[in-house]
Amino acid sequence: MSFDINWEQLRNDSNLNRTVTEKLNGYLTSINLPSYVNNLRIERFSMGDRPPKVTLRQITDPVQDFYDAINEELQMSAEEETEGSDDEGYGGDRVRNRGIDTQTVFPSANDVQFLVEMEYNGNMSITVTAEMVLNYPSKKFMALPIRLTISNIGFHTLCLIAFLSKQLFFSFLCDVTDPILDEDDSILDQNGPLLSSKGPLERISIIRSLSISTEVGEEYQGDGSVLKSVGKLEQFLKEKLKDFLRKEVAWPSWINFDFYEPEDNESDDNQIN
């Protein structure tokens, strides 16, 4: 069953765009950069105005992993509050306002999970800035500011989308060409080959296509050493973007968005004891 989504609302959601940008930048700061690049960061993320084609496969209750993740976060917040009871920061207020004692979230009748097939060939784009370092005739001889735009991203995957405790969870499960999909009954089996995995599937690629355009000063466009480094950086970015999706967003990892507002109270839909 196919259905439409309000893509315009999603693409204009500042919280969503900020979360994705922060997640990407957090990943970039955790990796070792090659010697020819410095200060690599995501400057802008745009969802684009062309939505993916989404086909609903199954509707089920959320998997237990999502509840465990929320409860672990709440437990950590409670411990931080105990250690710093005089601290009136956001984390402490959030725990108090939710009226949590045992820091446990239980399944609610309003919780829902969708298994969807998602095919995307839109105009999403990611703008990246960096400094191209020239190490000749000496180390770090010159640093050139450059801007790279990642676009024409295409993928066709099976995804898990869950709504619970005012949070949205999103995870890539596998490519639609994966032979594991021939065993439909085992897709959402928590003891099956997909959800029981403790690491990302080595065979999942997610991204089927993408392109990168690079802006560099006109005075360097004919410089062979600069162009060679630009080519290496573009290939490096492609590999790291694919690694990011596999390690940070593909099961058993996910990206989640918290829609909890401080003014919410114990009338929340979910049962929190």
UniProtKB/Swiss-Prot annotation:
InterPro entries xrefs: Mdm12 (IPR027532), MMM1_dom (IPR019411), SMP_LBD (IPR031468)
Give the multimer and partner information: Component of the ER-mitochondria encounter structure (ERMES) or MDM complex, composed of MMM1, MDM10, MDM12 and MDM34. A MMM1 homodimer associates with one molecule of MDM12 on each side in a pairwise head-to-tail manner, and the SMP-LTD domains of MMM1 and MDM12 generate a continuous hydrophobic tunnel for phospholipid trafficking.
Organism of provenance: Vanderwaltozyma polyspora (strain ATCC 22028 / DSM 70294 / BCRC 21397 / CBS 2163 / NBRC 10782 / NRRL Y-8283 / UCD 57-17) (Kluyveromyces polysporus)
List the protein's name: Mitochondrial distribution and morphology protein 12
Where in the cell does this protein reside?
Answer: Mitochondrion outer membrane; Endoplasmic reticulum membrane
Q: Regarding domains, what does the record say?
A: The SMP-LTD domain is a barrel-like domain that can bind various types of glycerophospholipids in its interior and mediate their transfer between two adjacent bilayers.
Q: The SMP-LTD domain covers which part of the protein?
A: 1-260
Kindly give the membrane topology term recorded for this protein.
Peripheral membrane protein
Tell me the gene name.
Answer: MDM12
- Extract one GO BP annotation from the record: peroxisome organization
